[in-house]
Amino acid sequence: MQKLRVFLLALAALCISCEAKYFATNCELVHELRRQGFPEDKMRDWVCLIQNESGRNTSKMGTINKNGSRDYGLFQINDKYWCSKTSTPGKDCNVTCAEMLLDDITKASKCAKKIYKRHKFQAWYGWRNHCQGTLPDISKC
């Protein structure tokens, strides 16, 4: 029991030290997406998707969906297919959902690209409902 208590305290301390990232502007987000290797020709789509899915906040956890699943992080990656709710990486992206909430978006970006490769932007309701034909101007970024 004592070992469990120590482990939980260490885990809590680790979580406190992990801060989520909020991208204050579209340009700040664009610079990070470029760093992550997102293609320029789809950049406006990615920015719009992220604005509408997570509000540019890596720590965003969606409400529980009708099917019992939940969406996580900047790209709102779903735990039914893509990330594992346990501490063991799994599902199609071989990551934990907790990793989707980190300020380092490397794993979340890789997973989002995998989702896009399979389903394009249609995989995200935020893009479907708000971005088709209405993309942000990022020309000054």
UniProtKB/Swiss-Prot annotation:
Gene3D superfamilies xref list: 1.10.530.10
A Pfam family it matches: Lys
Active-site residue list: E53, D71
Gene Ontology biological process terms from the UniProt entry: defense response to bacterium; killing of cells of another organism
Matching SUPFAM superfamilies: Lysozyme-like (SSF53955)
EC number annotated for this UniProt entry: 3.2.1.17
UniProt catalytic activity: Hydrolysis of (1->4)-beta-linkages between N-acetylmuramic acid and N-acetyl-D-glucosamine residues in a peptidoglycan and between N-acetyl-D-glucosamine residues in chitodextrins
UniProt keyword terms in alphabetical order: Antimicrobial, Bacteriolytic enzyme, Disulfide bond, Glycosidase, Hydrolase, Signal
GO molecular function: lysozyme activity
Ranges for domain C-type lysozyme: 21-141
Disulfide bonding pattern of the chain: C27-C141, C48-C131, C83-C97, C93-C111
Signal peptide extent: 1-20
InterPro entries attached to this UniProt entry: Glyco_hydro_22, Glyco_hydro_22_CS, Lysozyme-like_dom_sf
Task of the protein: Lysozymes have primarily a bacteriolytic function; those in tissues and body fluids are associated with the monocyte-macrophage system and enhance the activity of immunoagents.
Similarity section: Belongs to the glycosyl hydrolase 22 family.
Protein name: Lysozyme
Record organism: Trichoplusia ni (Cabbage looper)
UniProt lineage: Eukaryota, Metazoa, Ecdysozoa, Arthropoda, Hexapoda
